[in-house]
Amino acid sequence: TGAVPDAKKIDTSADAACTSKSPNLMTEDWAVKDGKLANAYVYIKSGTLADGSKIGDWTFETPSTPATLDQNGCHYKPHVLGVMVNQPITITNSDPTTHNIHFTPKNNPDWNQSQPNGAASMTHKLAVAEVLVPVKCNQHPWMKSYVGVTKHPFFAVTGEDGSFTLKGVPPGKYTVVAWHEGGAN
């Protein structure tokens, strides 16, 4: 409860390409519409299935289809992304300027790459579960994103209406956590 912080206009004047493409770029920390919170990462943290087994004991196939993180309008899209351990993440630069993709995890190796405009997409994988991995652009300090990494497919990111769906969850008792960059889980 309480007042939602107002989005603030981002000063992109340090890069004319950013100012030209996104003259009214706003912060995305608190994406709230009609009291509904977007960009919260929701996942099963732990649980026991109806047969008594633990969700952490199960093995799930890693998707071969990559998730996508795009640098477009001098901000990351999506702002929050969920993947499974070792699922490829394709990173593209749709802007007319150079970006720097910098994953700053706690449990995975640091990954820091420059991506000029017009460059080919890059692919990155995170080998260890981690909630959440911050991603930034060293050249544009306002650019940030977060990647949630789990060993299972039971995660979602809340939409603009605050809704989410955890698909295919087997019957059992679970601890479900919602993470948001603005505070408590």
Provide a role label for each language-model segment.
Residues 2-185:
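Extracytoplasmic copper-binding redox domains, predominantly the cupredoxin/blue-copper superfamily
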